[in-house]
A protein has these predicted regions:
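Short, well-structured alpha-helical segments in soluble
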Residues: 31-35, 78-90, 112
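Extracellular/periplasmic periplasmic-binding protein-like sensory domains
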Residues: 109-180, 191-196, 244-264
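Periplasmic-binding protein-like
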Residues: 40-45, 90-100, 106, 118-124, ...
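Solvent-exposed, acidic/polar segments of extracytosolic/periplasmic ligand-binding ectodomains
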Residues: 209-264
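Extracytoplasmic ligand/sensor domains, especially the bilobed periplasmic-binding protein
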Residues: 1-71, 118-143
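Short, well-structured alpha-helical segments that form the helix of a local strand-helix-strand
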Residues: 197-214
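Extracytoplasmic "Venus flytrap"
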Residues: 44-52, 101, 149-150, 172-178
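Structural motif
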Residues: 25-28, 72-85, 155-156
């Protein structure tokens, strides 16, 4: 995760993120939905910093009619009241950020309530490698945006996904990919600088071209990655396993909006 204050005026020269700044992924969803000509959307996220960042990022690029913006309780498991209100609002689309168990419960209750006939569901961090083992077929066809996907076509990612599946018997999540990328970044910094000295490693990461599962990454001035963000669809692979696949690139080399406020 990447809270906006850490990317902005609370940044630190010794902090590097190998994930994303919170706004970036929903910014891509906002752009996709804006470009698709979607007229109205109902927004929902948990009431904490990441939830607020996610919806702020979405609205930065989506300029249609936001007919509702609801902040749910962090850790909430029952969404029947919210779904009833959403049904009454009849938005063309719904965009959610409900990570982890919240997303599992939300999508299952959405399906059980027949909400696909009311509104088209879009999401960020709610249907992914973390939740798909529980959601399975109920997540098929749902679109989301992400900086990584198991089908990204580069040598590092192919090896990572194959090795992970061989050891654990399933697809890795983006958390696993980012953990792998973090180790690659540390190794790169030591190799490039020829040292374990903090200042030299910092300089190597800040100016380098870091090899990762997402391709080679450069760091912004606030030490958050400048990276592609993809549109993904939940599908079944050739073996019938539910996963995600890239169906488009929304942003190429996308930088976050808070780096201008970062002063080391």
């Amino acid at each position: 995760a990447g809270p906006s204050p850490i990317a902005g005026d609370q940044c630190h020269e010794n902090f590097f993120s190998m994930s994303w700044q919170n706004d970036q992924t929903p910014e891509a969803m906002g752009k996709h939905m804006q470009d698709a000509g979607i007229k109205s959307v109902y927004l929902m996220a948990p009431n904490y910093q990441a939830g607020k960042d996610m919806l702020s990022g979405f609205k930065r690029y989506y300029k249609g009619n936001v007919v509702g913006e609801v902040y749910t309780k962090l850790g909430q498991s029952d969404f029947q009241a919210e779904l009833s209100a959403l049904r009454a609002a009849k938005p063309e689309t719904t965009m959610i950020f409900q990570p982890g168990g919240m997303g599992i419960n939300f999508v299952k209750q959405w399906k059980q309530a027949g909400m696909d006939g009311v509104s088209k569901l879009y999401q960020v961090f709610s249907v992914d490698g973390v939740s798909l083992p529980a959601l399975k077929d109920s997540a098929l066809g749902i679109l989301g945006t992400q900086t990584w996907s198991p089908d990204l076509d580069n040598p590092i990612n192919k090896k990572f996904v194959a090795d992970y599946k061989a050891q654990f018997g399933g697809y890795p999540s983006f958390y696993a990919a980012q953990a792998y990328d973090t180790i690659l970044a540390i190794d790169y910094a030591i190799a490039k600088s020829g040292s374990k000295d903090t200042a030299k490693m910092r300089a190597a990461l800040a100016t380098g071209d870091i090899p990762t599962t997402r391709g080679n990454l450069k760091m912004n001035t606030n030490h958050f990655p400048i990276q592609n963000i993809y549109l993904r669809e939940t599908v079944k692979d050739a073996d019938g396993v539910v996963t995600t696949k890239v169906i488009g690139t929304v942003f190429n080399n996308h930088a976050d909006s808070y780096a201008v406020n970062c002063k080391f």
